[in-house]
Amino acid sequence: MYKFCANALKVILSLRGGVKVYNKENLPADSGFVIACTHSGWVDVITLGVGILPYQIHYMAKKELFQNKWIGSFLKKIHAFPVDRENPGPSSIKTPIKLLKEGEIVGIFPSGTRTSEDVPLKRGAVTIAQMGKAPLVPAAYQGPSSGKELFKKGKMKLIIGEPLHQADFAHLPSKERLAAMTEALNQRIKELENKLDQL
């Protein structure tokens, strides 16, 4: 179902020029990984999924969306899994860590600007990557952020950064490691956004 939906969306997006993807070779080919991409609307979630095909991403989605049996069933088929955003706890990271250890890809979408939600999400991406012993890949998207904007002119650009590897931070104590990796992620995402402005 995931592959079918992603390829169908790829065809639809191609009608407006498609998605230009830069540095796709930065995606790890030999392990699962966390990909943290800038977020301004639902379009960037779709763009990331289409842009890195044939890789398939597992997404976090708020648990309320799964309360409807049919919607919940569809979301599971396209690799979404429920998370309690109001009361996040240890159970919120069990699923993504398990997926990483199975060699799968987990997508997390901190916003592009430093909002109150942004820093915890980046820290969450780092925590999941560390506990899953997986690389953390920064990414940035630039283009339409809503369905209304999607059918207007304007490029859709996605850029993939070089992965952050756990080994590069292993010399630090655990608390410092979390802070250092979060700051490194933030810095790389900023650099990617600046590069997109020039492309």
Curated annotation (Swiss-Prot):
Compartment list: Cell membrane
Listed CDD domains: LPLAT_AGPAT-like
Pathway field: Lipid metabolism; phospholipid metabolism
InterPro entries in the cross-refs: AGP_acyltrans, Plipid/glycerol_acylTrfase
Free-text disruption phenotype from the record: Cells lacking this gene cease to produce phospholipid and accumulate fatty acids arising from the dephosphorylation of 1-acylglycerol-3-P.
Keywords, ordered alphabetically: Acyltransferase, Cell membrane, Lipid biosynthesis, Lipid metabolism, Membrane, Phospholipid biosynthesis, Phospholipid metabolism, Transferase
Motif (HXXXXD motif): 39-44
Record-level Gene Ontology MF annotations: 1-acylglycerol-3-phosphate O-acyltransferase activity
Claim: Metal-binding is one of the keywords in the record: no
Catalytic reaction list: a fatty acyl-[ACP] + a 1-acyl-sn-glycero-3-phosphate = a 1,2-diacyl-sn-glycero-3-phosphate + holo-[ACP]
One Gene Ontology cellular component annotation held by this UniProt entry: plasma membrane
Domain notes from UniProt: The HXXXXD motif is essential for acyltransferase activity and may constitute the binding site for the phosphate moiety of the glycerol-3-phosphate.
NCBIfam families (alphabetical): AGP_acyltrn
Entry function: Converts lysophosphatidic acid (LPA) into phosphatidic acid (PA) by incorporating an acyl moiety at the 2 position. This enzyme utilizes acyl-ACP as fatty acyl donor, but not acyl-CoA.
Designated name of the protein: 1-acyl-sn-glycerol-3-phosphate acyltransferase
Protein's organism: Bacillus subtilis (strain 168)
Gene that encodes it: plsC
